[in-house]
Amino acid sequence: MGEQVLVVPREILFCNESTAFQGFREENAHPYLRMIAESSLFLPRDDVEEDPNYKQIIPYAVVSHAPPAGSERWFLMRRKKGGGEKRLHNLYSLGVGGHINPVDDHIDDGIVERALLRELEEELSVPREREVNPIGLLND
């Protein structure tokens, strides 16, 4: 069996397209996090990768650092050539993210945050005790 990823049926997430959008939307993510907790399930990634009926939930973090006496700095990462997704090889990312898998524990209100903290720890060695602040939603 292949990789399992967290998905939500598109019709539930976007109320039969009445709330659908494309790109980034700065808004309160908490209603969507509740919807994810109540309506998500794990399915094989190969089955949903090209299926428009399911939205894969992929937490993504943009990381900044504001030193006490300096200007804010932003994390930028160049993807390795040997990474999993060939379309991303040698490209730059402004943040870090990844699919939510069953390893991220049970499905509840905190699953998206736990998965994001796991990803930050894996990619950047950031301790999981950090605070994350949702600033919006990205739909692609």
Please place each PLM-identified region on the residue numbering.
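Extreme N-terminus nucleophile/cap motif
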Residues: 1-34
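Short N-terminal helix-initiation segments at or just after the protein's N-terminus
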Residues: 1-7, 33-42, 89-100
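Conserved Nudix-box catalytic region and its N-terminal flanking loop in Nudix hydrolases
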Residues: 72-118, 122
